[in-house]
Regions:
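Polytopic transmembrane helical bundles with strong interfacial aromatic enrichment
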Residues: 2-268
Length: 268
């Protein structure tokens, strides 16, 4: 009697993944465009901030970019864990597809943060705990991409990249703790926030958002839209990688068949 496959097992099949992603991609892309356009429009027409003036509008791109830079690395870490522990067929595909996208969003966060910092801090860059840790995250992305492309053996490259990704995941809580600290009363753990110019979160706080509704809602729309954009690009990247591996397998098979024909002809 055949056992019923779980959803995870079904999605582990590249053919099913291609079929499902082909259906979802247009919807994800459409939702992303609508939400980003609406969020940025609401942000552009929102009143200026009473302290930061018009420069507050950079927030509607900077904050989603920073969030997705960290989320992208978390996705790589989870995918790497799935590859090393569960040997999931698509885990490496997911990690490879997410790396350049996460790197792009992290770079966008660094650039927009510098543009935002100039009028607020008087300089484009300071070696602040938050800024430096996000820069380290960007270098980690570049390291993952460089390591993978420098090794011809795909199996070895995927495993080494997965190990590096899991080692580097410690940067994510470091980024968060650098400006907000960490408090776990039941463990007696208290890590104070560092002396940093970067402001703490104004949205996800235990005491509620510290941002006016006229700025909060455009930011949420924009963040949600960019999140849909991330998954659109990620899904498209996975499809491209699956197709690339299929083409490579076909070429290898064709070369093997050609060698067999040559060997048979030589034997005759």
């Amino acid at each position: 009697m055949m056992q019923k496959q779980s959803i995870t097992q079904k999605l582990a099949n590249p053919t099913r993944c291609m079929a499902l992603s082909g259906t979802l991609l247009p919807w994800l892309a459409g939702i992303a465009v609508i939400l980003i356009a609406y969020g940025l429009y609401r942000g552009w027409t929102a009143p200026p901030d009473y302290q930061q003036g018009e420069t507050i509008r950079i927030m509607y791109i900077h904050v989603p970019s920073a969030w997705l830079g960290m989320m992208g690395y978390a996705l790589i870490a989870v995918s790497s864990f799935g590859l090393l522990v569960f040997r999931h067929p698509l885990a490496d595909v997911s990690a490879k597809a997410a790396a350049p996208i996460g790197a792009a969003f992290t770079m966008m966060a660094l650039v927009t943060g510098s543009l935002w910092g100039k009028p607020m801090w008087g300089t484009y860059w300071v070696w602040d705990a938050r800024l430096t840790s996000v820069l380290m995250l960007f270098f980690l992305y570049l390291g993952l991409i460089a390591l993978r492309t420098s090794i011809e053996d795909e199996s070895l490259a995927s495993k080494l990249t997965a190990v590096l990704a899991l080692v580097g995941v410690v940067i994510l809580p470091f980024i968060k703790i650098s400006v907000e600290g960490l408090s776990i009363p039941w463990l007696g753990l208290e890590i104070p926030a560092w002396n940093t110019l970067h402001q703490p979160s104004s949205v996800f706080r235990t005491d509620g958002p510290k941002i006016h509704a006229s700025q909060l809602y455009p930011l949420l729309y924009s963040a949600l839209g960019f999140t849909f954009l991330f998954f659109t690009l990620h899904m498209k990247g996975m499809r491209n990688e699956i197709l690339r591996r299929r083409v490579k397998a076909l070429r290898i098979a064709e070369v093997d068949r050609a060698r067999e024909r040559e060997a048979v002809a030589a034997a005759e």
